[in-house]
Design a protein with these regions (language model features):
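Intrinsically disordered, low-complexity acidic/polar segments
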Residues: 47, 74-76, 133-137
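A short glycine/small-residue-enriched secondary-structure motif
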Residues: 55-61, 100-103
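Mid-chain, well-packed structural core segment of small domains
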Residues: 68-92
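Oligomerization/assembly interface segments of phage tail-like spikes and tubes
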Residues: 57-71, 120-131
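Acidic-leaning, charged glycine-interspersed low-complexity segments
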Residues: 88-132
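Small/polar-rich, solvent-exposed N-terminal microdomains that initiate assembly or binding
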Residues: 1-53, 90, 137
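Short, solvent-exposed beta-strand/turn "edge" segments of beta-rich domains on protein surfaces
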Residues: 52-57, 115-117
C-alpha cells in the first residue's frame, strides 16, 4: 500500500520546492513556493479483482497536488505545468512502501485563482497507480 507520505516524499525528491515547503495533508503556514499533497476529496469508483484481493496486482491512490507559488500567474503556471510533465513521465518509482508504477493524471493542471494574500495557486489531480505485493513477496 502506498500512503500519502510516500507520494509527498517523491514529490519532494523532485526538487521543485524545498523539502520543508512540501506539505502533506495540510498547508498551514502557506509560505510562497510551496507544494501541498492531499488525499483527493473527489469520489472515484473502487476497482477489485474478480478473484479477490489476493489476485490484485495494483492499487490506486487518488491525490490532489496544490502548487502555491508566488504572485506571478506566469511563474505559477510554469511550475504547475513542469511538475505535471514530470509526473506524466514518471515510471517505476521505488518508495519505502512499494513501487509507484505511474501517475495517471486526471486532467491538465487547473488554475484555482489566488489565496487571501494574492499568491497564485494551481492544482493537479492524479491517481497514483502502485504495485501491490502478494502474500509472501
Amino acid at each position: 500500500m502506498i500512503t500519502l507520505g510516500s507520494v509527498r516524499e517523491y514529490i519532494s525528491s523532485l526538487g521543485v520546492a524545498e523539502d520543508e515547503h512540501v506539505y502533506m495533508g495540510t498547508l498551514d503556514v502557506k509560505q510562497e513556493k510551496s507544494l501541498g499533497v492531499y488525499n483527493s476529496k473527489h469520489q472515484y469508483s473502487s476497482h477489485r479483482a474478480l478473484g479477490g484481493p489476493d489476485l490484485e496486482g495494483y492499487g490506486e491512490k487518488y491525490v490532489t497536488i496544490l502548487v502555491h507559488w508566488d504572485k506571478s500567474p506566469r511563474d505559477t503556471e510554469m511550475v504547475a505545468v513542469g511538475l505535471y510533465e514530470t509526473l506524466r513521465r514518471a515510471r517505476d518509482i521505488l518508495t519505502e512502501e512499494g513501487t509507484i508504477k505511474f501517475f495517471q493524471l486526471l486532467y491538465d493542471p487547473q488554475d484555482i485563482g489566488k489565496d487571501d494574500t494574492g499568491i497564485c495557486e494551481w492544482v493537479i489531480e492524479a491517481a497514483v497507480i502502485f504495485e501491490k505485493k502478494r502474500e509472501g513477496e
